[in-house]
Amino acid sequence: MKKIAISPGDLAGVGPDICIKAFKDLSKTSTPVFFGDPNLFEHRAKSLNIDIDIREYEGEDDLIQDKFYVKSYEFNSKITPGYPTPIYADYLIEILKEATKLNLSREFSALVTGPINKELINKGGIEFKGHTEFLAKESNTEKVVMMLANEHLKVALATTHEPLRNVPSLITEDHISDCINIINNDLQDKWKINNPNIKVLGLNPHAGDG
């Protein structure tokens, strides 16, 4: 099965807990590798009363399916769940950069990112608008579109992480056209939808009035 890289997100948030709780289901369809401190995952698993057998991931392909593989990045400061702090902002970005790099090199087939506190990272002295913009920069991709998707519905956003007052000026004919082209191409190429049916919603609730 394909290997997927998973960054847990905010160390003091629910991300590590979600990783641990979702591990068994994830392992049915893929081979997950979690990026972070093994001690953090072990501590959180104990607090959840969930048994996991942690193994350190070292780049191998023949992973044992029921083992909890961690690409190890030690973090020596104390983490208290529910109390986020900017002291680990650099650490979060380091993990994201490494996970992104290994995906771009095809060592992994996908990257899953846990919930992250953008304000916390910015308070740590790092400019961070969101995962979408971060991944675009790391992959040298000029134009990207964020999509929320499940098997029944896919919703793409024309703008992301922008103050509402700035949005009207960003909704231009060229920008919407670029978004539609990206969505159309990826629905056909990555989702194997031969003739995508794309609906465009207006910013103004009366945009459809005659």
Predicted features by range, described:
Residues K123-V145:
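Glycine/threonine-rich beta-strand-loop-alpha-helix active-site module
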Residues E60-D62, E138, V167, I171:
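Short alpha-helical interface patches
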Residues L148-C179:
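Ligand-binding beta-strand-loop-alpha-helix segment within the catalytic cores
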Residues M1-H131, D174-G210:
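Contiguous, glycine/small-aliphatic-enriched amphipathic segments in soluble metabolic enzymes
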Residues V145-M146, Q188:
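Short beta-strand/turn micro-motifs at beta-sheet edges
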Residues E56, V70-S72, M146-A149, L157:
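Structural signal for conserved beta-strand scaffold positions within catalytic alpha/beta enzyme cores
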